[in-house]
Amino acid sequence: MAPSNLPPVFNATSQDIEMLLAAQCHLGSKNLQVHMEPYLWKTRPDGINVINIGKTWEKIVLAARIIAAVDNPADICVISARPYGQRAVLKFAAHTGAVAIAGRFTPGNFTNYITRSFKEPRLIIVTDPRTDHQAIKEASYVNIPVIALCDTDSPTEFVDVAIPTNNKGRHAIGLIWWMLAREVLRLRGTLASRETEWDVVVDLYFYRDPEAEENKEIEEAKVPGAEEVGAAAIESGLVGDSWEAQAAPAFAGAGVPAGAAPGWEAEGGVDWAASSAAPADTWAGESGNPDAGVKW
C-alpha cells in the first residue's frame, strides 16, 4: 500500500486494512477504464486488476468529510439499484439521517417537480455508476455533486468523487458503506473519539438472500431427528429402536400368540382350492325349462 497523504489522525488502522482485504474490496474487474487507472495497483497474471487499498481509504475519508459538511442530513440521498447494495443504503440512511432510494430509481425524481417523489438533494451517493446511471444523469442536469463506488470498469462521467472499490461483491459493498457511515459519525462527533469502537457490526450492512433466510428458518423449525424416524412414526407414537417389540401386542390381541411372527402362509394346511370347489348353479341347466318355478 502506498503511503497515505492524509493527516495522521485519518490514517487507516491495520484492522481497517485487513477488513478491506477480507471483503475483497481490492479485486477489480478485468476491464480498466482510463480514468480509474490512477487507482490501479497492478494487474494479476489472470487479468484481474488489483485496486490500491490506500487510495480507497483516502477517498472514503474525503467522501465522509463532504457528507459531514452538509448541515441537514436529509439533504443527502443514497441510491442503490443493485440488490447487493440496497440493504446497505437503508442502514446508512438509518444511521446518518440520509434519504435512501433502494431499488429502481424513478426517472424524474430530481428533474420533474410534478411527481410526488420529487427531491432536491444537495448531494447524492450511488453504489454503482453503471446501474445508477439515471440518477447520475439527472443530477448532472440540476448541478448535484455525486459520490460513487467505482470499480475499475465503471464509467466516471459526471462523478465528482470516485471511491475505488469492488462494487459487485456483497461483502465489499456492505463494508464500504459501513466504513463511510462510521467516518461520518466520527466527524460529526457522534462517536466520542477515533479510538471508540462503533457498536454496529458490519454484518448488518451485508446483503441477505431472502430464500436462504427462509430455508434457514425452516431447517431450524424442524423436529430434531425427524428425518431419521419419519413423520408418520412421530404422529403415531411408534418411535423406538425395535419395531417388532411394539408390533407384537397387536397380533396377540387378534388371536395370534405373542411370540409368533405373522406370516402369509395359511395355518393347518388349509387348501384354498378345495374350499372354492363348491357346487355352483349352471345357467345351462335352467335354460332347458325356462318357465319352471316362475310365477309372474
Curated annotation (Swiss-Prot):
* Biased composition regions of type Low complexity, renumbered to the chain: 274-284
Q: Which family does it belong to?
A: Belongs to the universal ribosomal protein uS2 family.
The protein's location, in the record's own words, is: Cytoplasm
UniProt keyword Ribonucleoprotein present: yes
Write down the HAMAP family for this protein, in alphabetical order. Answer: Ribosomal_S2_euk
The subunit structure is:
Component of the small ribosomal subunit. Mature ribosomes consist of a small (40S) and a large (60S) subunit. The 40S subunit contains about 33 different proteins and 1 molecule of RNA (18S). The 60S subunit contains about 49 different proteins and 3 molecules of RNA (25S, 5.8S and 5S). Interacts with RPS21.
Record-linked NCBIfam families: uS2_euk_arch
Q: What is its main location?
A: cytoplasm
Q: Where is this region: Disordered?
A: 274-296
Record protein name field: Small ribosomal subunit protein uS2
Q: Which GO terms describe its cellular component?
A: cytosolic small ribosomal subunit
